[in-house]
Swiss-Prot record:
Acetyl-CoA binds at residues 97-99, 106-110, 136-138. It is an enzyme of class 2 (transferase). This is Uncharacterized N-acetyltransferase in pepI 3'region. GO terms for molecular function: acyltransferase activity, transferring groups other than amino-acyl groups. The lineage of its organism: Bacteria, Bacillati, Bacillota, Bacilli, Lactobacillales. Keywords: Acyltransferase, Transferase. It holds the Pfam family Acetyltransf_1. InterPro entries: Acyl_CoA_acyltransferase, Bact_Acetyltransf, GNAT_dom. It comes from Lactobacillus delbrueckii subsp. lactis. Its EC number is 2.3.1.-. Residues 4-173 form the N-acetyltransferase domain.
Length: 173
């Protein structure tokens, strides 16, 4: 696919970053959760203060995937103290990886994932890990095809609903 670029997100990109974050999260999980829980989650976690703070956090890195100049998806990587769990002090967490619906099933998720692996190796990380909702079969299958295996789980709260995320990892050697 021509015209594909992965570029780092900065504070000037915040309005576009908020928009794609809300769109992709709602598209991915809206049908499986109540409108009330979804609205509460989006209001609390995908806003200017929260995402602006995340962009400024040391050890957190955001990237847009652009196709012919249009933002098609994004990726959030965490290292060191920015990781959400104490999985491995030398780990790389993929905290978020999302594509707009119109860009799915075109190999772009694979490109974002491979970019994350490259960053992990560039940063001399030994383990790549992430959390995935236990009911997100498409994502679980994708991660299995990329060599990740389940090692634990944690609770993810969406609105008032306590859900289970499986934690998956793979070695970066």
């Amino acid at each position: 696919m021509t015209g594909v670029k992965i570029v780092q997100v900065s504070e000037k990109d915040l309005p576009e970053f908020i928009a794609i974050s809300r769109e992709t999260f709602a598209d991915t999980f809206g049908k499986d959760n109540s409108p009330e829980d979804m609205a509460k989650f989006l209001e609390k976690t995908i806003n200017e203060d929260k995402l602006g703070g995340e962009i400024a956090t040391p050890g957190s890195f955001f990237y847009f995937l652009k196709v012919d100049g249009e933002v098609a998806g994004y990726l959030k990587l965490d290292v060191d103290d920015a990781q959400n769990e104490e999985v491995d002090p030398n780990g790389l967490e993929i905290e978020r990886i999302y594509l707009r619906k119109s860009f799915q099933h075109r190999g772009l998720g694979k490109q974002l994932f491979e970019f994350a692996e490259e960053k992990g190796r560039e940063w001399s990380k030994s383990v790549l890990w992430l959390g995935v909702w236990e009911h997100n079969e498409n994502a679980k299958n994708f991660y299995a095809s990329r060599g990740l295996t389940r090692f634990s789980e944690h609770v993810f709260v969406l609105g008032d609903d306590r859900q289970t995320d499986f934690l998956l990892k793979k070695a970066l050697v």
